[in-house]
Amino acid sequence: TKNGSVRTPQSIQSYATLATIVFQTNQNEQHGGQSIPAFDHFMAPGVLKTFRRHLTDMTLFLCGVRGGVTLERAELKALVAEHVPTIEPCETAVGRLFAALRQSGVEVADEDIRRIWRQAYDTTRRETHQAMEGFIHNLNTMHSRGGNQVVFSSVNYGTDFSPEGRMVIRELLSATIEGLGHGEVPVFPIQIFKVKEGVSWSEEDYAAAVKDFDKALAGEIKFKTPNFDLLIEACRTTSVALFPNFMFLDAPFNRHEKWRIDDPDRFRYEVATMGCRTRVFENLHGEKSSWGRGNLSFTSMNLPRLAIEAMREAGDMIPDGNKHAIRKEAREIFLESVRKTATMMAEQLYERYCFQRTALARQFPFMMSNDVWKGGGRLQPNDEVGDVLKHGTLGIGFIGGHNAMVAIYGEG
């Protein structure tokens, strides 16, 4: 930031806290909302770091109590980092750590390592839950520079099936159900669960869940896809806490040809949204992606007004006509008005875009210097943002479709 640099966080609580600070700092340089495209993938390293720290501390404590050969904390920390790739208490990972400790001269029983592992896992889960609680509470209380609104935040998640990513998702959902004080439902962050065939969905899993839904809710069914149980938990959370919303990555317009389930960076090819409305994916000037991009401007069309004007004009043109003739004429007038208005809006948005390009990079120090906007990191402070914004979108929206139909047809 312009006030100093921040070191890489070393615990899940620090990861979550810095995520809120990033939201707030970025909010102060823009209008509207912002979104993290792969929250589970980004928070997962914090879970693993927390687990390794607890594993290190508990092993040191055990060796200190029992006496005998032990290692310096820095040595043991490095050993754990090298031999513990996951929080999952699988035989391979536990065996690797046990063998490495014995090779270093640390006398510790295999069963002791398993107990320590379970204890470190439980402690990490509790801290992850607290981190997600803090994340939610902070985003519903900390204000942006405007002072009259909390930071408008969104997080997308659902496709990280690593044990660490799954823990983040599960504890975020749990903290969302718990809510704020006095049972208040948290409004922020807006949450979007990404549903993907082979990751969190399959027809086989759906059939198994429907067959015995009570067992599915209780987590007593082993599903084929790794995150189908989290999809069920997400649906349960939505039923009581409004969020998450759901994004279906297999819809034809949401697919990316480069997405592969074995790619650790697959989240780069997943569409993400801001809130319940802003989808940025296709790109006229580069690869389609939601990363480092956003909506630059939007203008909404007032459909009821156009419909009312169309009915009045049609009535004047056919003063003695029946309602069907008037409606037919009004429909044509209305559709032509929509075309003309959309063209005018496009011209207005482009004119504004040309002005937006003249802004200087130093007006957005955090956003540009950290490459939050794709390409912003290459700019000097007094450079115009210019082509950095060409990856953004211009939005033509509308409001009142139902009311417009009532105005023309007398019914919705």
Model-derived regions: residue spans:
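Contiguous, well-ordered alpha-helical segments that form the cores/surfaces of helical PPI scaffolds
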Residues: L394-A407
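Conserved catalytic cores of very large enzyme subunits
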Residues: T1-H391, A407, E411-G412
